[in-house]
């Protein structure tokens, strides 16, 4: 039985009031949350269906549900003899009810509210969830284009033109568009988007300027002035130790006006400005007479502190007060109308976007959340009771996991369904791990409760704070190192939270052995400081990365050398906590964490060269794969063949196959014209050489294909076009024969899937699709699914810090610790915050741009947010390590590699000051993790000898063990090298036998690694019926059957509509029909008409849907089951799975190492506490049920296997639903499923 700590036990048992559990990394918060639920069920006979349990991901929800059910079953088994009969019955009942419990994401909970009470807000329930970010962006883009044209043509055109000029560049008006999209996104995170937008101009009212200054600007300025005063006070204390008072007097002269200002209650803008602008710092006296060496050191230390304060005063603060209050008032009178116009346009855009979504019957998650909140603020028209009261009455407790990632909108939703007197909320999280600011999470909501809730309150109804500080994951040094860093860098001023004793990690993993390896800081560096000159290290890096490529390579080599040492050194071991013994380190124990994926390709290349296996968890390079780049280039050429770069890319690719010499030959035909014109000129000329003739023939063939593709693009959908390209060019076959062929073919298939989804969203046309893909690339979206970690795969793992959250690894390397923070959102003409907007105002007459005070305040607020989140990201990264932790970086000066001594000197200067926490200006001025880590370490006794710094008294007793290793030339030895062939000219090799030898895996050459269910269902049914050696046409890659030419009597009805089209439309109707309502002929007709109105189904096709057959189906036992359990019905479920090839194709039995990737879409299944009921609709005309069952048996076998892999429940029934005949066959019951 688990032994819980005192604080864990409190979190499990305390109730009757709101509880906030601040659970540090590795403190077992999920275990505590599950145990709290179990204890309530066991000891209080609580009903799990009366608990609302929410978290942020579907994976976490599924894991939570499984853990609760497993724990309840374990309790029933282990405590059966201790429990009374009533207790056993209650526990058994709760186990059965776990699947019905409200354990969900906040998005799913909001959706459930909307689906239940849609009629309260007059919402059409037949909406589709808009989950694709790129599709959402394109919808916004289309609405914005229409609105922009309307505004240019209206009376508001002059004001709109000024707005565009102020926020966009000279080339286009994309700046205003981007701002408008971000405004809508920011407003969407608030409880009242319209109020947020309407209030944007309020702080710009001239009459409210003083209030704006005192409430928004003065607190920030005062904080900076206090930092300056602290530095000057420290400098003054040092100067007072000197025999000559001149330096002390100089510093006091600087300090006096500052102290007077800070003592002033609510100073005006002009008062602050007067002090900052008028004060002059006297030149530092150079007198040295009478000073010994110690005095000189003290004098220099005082000067450094004064210089730092002077720099902040003169370079950061004074420039922001350049304008007098009167001048600011004049600017605000000009700027306020501009911001009011911005707000007005944003409101119109919001309304237009809402109307377009309604017309398309789509809702995104933000819409769902706002609609849910609107519903909770209404009364139920049927009962007259507030709907929120209904929810509050149905829950005994509201439990929230990962509470630190909550947004204001989500907080309002939870508050609406929670009681307050006494509170019934149980919130678990760690604000130090709040790393989702880009999703508009607001950690201040957690911090406010953390600071106001009490530890062990005397009032039983008062909200309580419980801190779980014990870490059961990591060794002592990992925790001590983390505490050492964060106790010096995190406080409310920079980091939002004080990293005090309560927040510090406590060692709790008492089962570790005696060895606690020291943390290592690995730095790639230059050899000596005199080498700091322009060289290769100045080469620009990736567009997405400030780090030069050679510096990233050096760091990777450092890591590789250390990994090879860990693997090869028998003394480098890990403690096996299960076996309670030491063991050797394996590659799979090691994980590399990065802030971004921009260097993944470089890291992969370096690891491959060294022979070190690497698994990349973040697949963000889909569009950078060769096959996708070639396909996108071809699509661009089909759309517009006069694009030089895509055209040359296609000509050079395997699709055409021209060599570099042939491309040069074409260019010689016309040198000073676009390349397409050169191709045209070349084709018109008479070929004079064999190479020219061959090139001419290849170009002629390609342009004939291109003409065909262009015709297809005009007359058909994108899926048909893409399949035609794959077939006619053989490109899909070609990539299958290259290294990683099955993955490349899967990538090309994913492009088709994306095209299908794109057109299903109502978008049409090749040009728009290319634009769609371009947007996906810009927004860093990917079509490839992240690969899943195989625990048996002995490979180093590479992933982002975000991806690692919630995970733990024996050995962790934090990479790129010198990489600059992304501050790009602190530039530009506007900065958005949750309080509003700060803008630069462009004078339309002079074209002079002014940074308004509101802009400076917004910039400071955004900078603080960014630094706090980067600090929390660092915390997450360090706390992933269980036993060994490495921090990897480079000694940098700007964007150049510098020597270690210069970097250490910079750290030592930043480490000055007596307080344990580093000076605020040092922490707020950091541009990378090393800017925090270096100064924090350099003050520690372990760093003695690395720099001439004073060890801080607060760190003298600190027992953290770490080393800083600097390497200028890391050496990596390839793990495996190719065996050299002996140079023996006297040896004759008979190659004829090799050429005559039969290839042992001939069958595999006629299959592809990527198969759809429809392509292999016959083979899966009865492998003996297929002769694989001669099955090229059946097994080769091909489009769906509807794309093949077939006799008209097979493919068309008398009206000319294909059965496939009717079947697809029928499936769509069954997918969208509302199972929560009675199914009638009228409701089916209404849904059909809606789909034709929105052009989802063609009118001609809709007429042939047999609605009577659908009514007949819902009258069967299976149909009634679907209607009885609508919430448990899952429809149109896509899946992919790997199967051993010899299971699918018997002829591959001799090749057991190969896998086949199978994909498909399951029509639907019902999941309840007993198991899963699978069903699949068929619209075949054949009346012979036995033949149809035989035809589709294998397909359902695959679906059942896929469902078994997706979730743990058994598949109890497999139904084939033949809609034409009204027959429903259970393959399991009939024995036909075997």
Swiss-Prot record:
Known function: The heterodimer acts as both an ATP-dependent DNA helicase and an ATP-dependent, dual-direction single-stranded exonuclease. Recognizes the chi site generating a DNA molecule suitable for the initiation of homologous recombination. The AddA nuclease domain is required for chi fragment generation; this subunit has the helicase and 3' -> 5' nuclease activities.
Q: Needs which cofactor? A: Mg(2+)
Domain UvrD-like helicase ATP-binding per the UniProt entry, residue ranges = 2-475
Listed GO CC annotations: cytosol; DNA helicase complex
Q: What is its EC number?
A: 3.1.-.-, 5.6.2.4
GO function terms (MF aspect): 3'-5' DNA helicase activity; 3'-5' exonuclease activity; ATP binding; ATP hydrolysis activity; double-stranded DNA binding
Q: Name one GO biological process term.
A: double-strand break repair via homologous recombination
Catalysed reactions, semicolon-separated: Couples ATP hydrolysis with the unwinding of duplex DNA by translocating in the 3'-5' direction; ATP + H2O = ADP + phosphate + H(+)
The record, for InterPro entries, names: AddA, DNA_helicase_UvrD-like_C, DNA_helicase_UvrD/REP, P-loop_NTPase, PDDEXK-like_dom_sf, PDDEXK_AddAB-type, Restrct_endonuc-II-like, UvrD-like_ATP-bd
Any idea where the UvrD-like helicase C-terminal domain is?
Answer: 507-806
Membrane keyword on record = no
Q: Which family does it belong to?
A: Belongs to the helicase family. AddA subfamily.
Whom does it interact with, and what assembly results? Heterodimer of AddA and AddB/RexB.
NCBIfam families for this protein: addA_Gpos
Protein name in the entry: ATP-dependent helicase/nuclease subunit A
Its keywords, alphabetically, are:
ATP-binding, DNA damage, DNA repair, DNA-binding, Exonuclease, Helicase, Hydrolase, Isomerase, Nuclease, Nucleotide-binding
Could you tell me which Gene3D superfamilies the record lists for this protein? 3.90.320.10, P-loop containing nucleotide triphosphate hydrolases
> What positions does the entry give for ATP binding?
23-30
